[in-house]
Amino acid sequence: MIEKIWSGESPLWRLLLPLSWLYGLVSGAIRLCYKLKLKRAWRAPVPVVVVGNLTAGGNGKTPVVVWLVEQLQQRGIRVGVVSRGYGGKAESYPLLLSADTTTAQAGDEPVLIYQRTDAPVAVSPVRSDAVKAILAQHPDVQIIVTDDGLQHYRLARNVEIVVIDGVRRFGNGWWLPAGPMRERAGRLKSVDAVIVNGGVPRSGEIPMHLLPGQAVNLRTGTRCDVAQLEHVVAMAGIGHPPRFFATLKMCGVQPEKCVPLADHQSLNHADVSALVSAGQTLVMTEKDAVKCRAFAEENWWYLPVDAQLSGDEPAKLLTQLTLLASGN
């Protein structure tokens, strides 16, 4: 229902307009206060890069964060990552992730990023505290990438990158809750790069698509072509589950059942195992896998995806960030 409201297919969005005007008024006032320096943002001693979005829901932001961190690491840059840790609840903040940190403590995206990149990752509702925690334990870090947080103006930033779903884009264009917008589309004029996940990019936007890898068994780590798996049940607890189901079909998989779950939904063995019957194979997203690995069955697999950015702009962006991190 929410997708139909935000896309404009359902007329119910009109009933929510008063709340949207209130949301827009408050969010605009907050940004204006920081812009006029009525409120002070904390500036880190190293450059900060924000990877965020203008809309609620999945846009492919986390794969972009992983891509950015890995690309900078390949250039010899020491990167730290901070996040709010949405969906997790730590005993205290900031929380610096370790190999023992669970998604229940830190949230699923931070754990995924930590496992994929081996970069220092810290979470806190106050992102400046997370930055301080990383720099205290890893003083060699040269640049901070913040996963989401475009609207978290308490943390000053050097570079802003926005990720857009190229198919859904901005829906009906209204602020939450009548539409998907956290900020209006005009905000794009002030950011440094716009990355478009799928669809047809517009002038000045960087095209991106998600490239699926081999399926990975949660229990054994065995890899295989996902099309070799039989009697597949697909599960996705991400911001936009249909994207994952479409990716499977693109890989030649015709799931016997597709199970969309809420983003950041808590998972347990009983609920997940009930999704598959004898002889079926469960295939999930990598984001779900970080929550299920501790209690996985032998027939549970996940499909990792990597962000692939096209054109000349990604190289220019990476050069800019490398120089920034190097102090040039």
Swiss-Prot record:
Instruction: Give the E.C. number(s).
Output: 2.7.1.130
Q: What class of enzyme is it?
A: transferase
Q: In which pathway does it act?
A: Glycolipid biosynthesis; lipid IV(A) biosynthesis; lipid IV(A) from (3R)-3-hydroxytetradecanoyl-[acyl-carrier-protein] and UDP-N-acetyl-alpha-D-glucosamine: step 6/6
- Binding of ATP, residues: T55, A56, G57, G58, N59, G60, K61, T62
- Keyword Kinase attached: yes
Keyword rRNA-binding assigned: no
Task: Identify a single GO molecular function assigned to this protein.
Answer: ATP binding
Any idea which UniProt keywords this protein has?
A: ATP-binding, Kinase, Lipid A biosynthesis, Lipid biosynthesis, Lipid metabolism, Nucleotide-binding, Transferase
- What SUPFAM superfamilies has UniProt attached to this entry? P-loop containing nucleoside triphosphate hydrolases
Report the GO terms under cellular component: plasma membrane
What superkingdom does the record give?
Answer: Bacteria
> Which Cys-Cys disulphide bridges does the record give?
none
Catalyzes what? a lipid A disaccharide + ATP = a lipid IVA + ADP + H(+)
Signal sequence segment: none
**Gene Ontology terms: biological process:** lipid A biosynthetic process; lipopolysaccharide core region biosynthetic process
According to its UniProt entry, the function of this protein is described as: Transfers the gamma-phosphate of ATP to the 4'-position of a tetraacyldisaccharide 1-phosphate intermediate (termed DS-1-P) to form tetraacyldisaccharide 1,4'-bis-phosphate (lipid IVA).
Tell me the protein family, please.
Belongs to the LpxK family.
Identify the NCBIfam families for this entry: lpxK (TIGR00682)
Protein name per its UniProtKB record: Tetraacyldisaccharide 4'-kinase
The beginning of the lineage is: Bacteria, Pseudomonadati, Pseudomonadota, Gammaproteobacteria, Enterobacterales
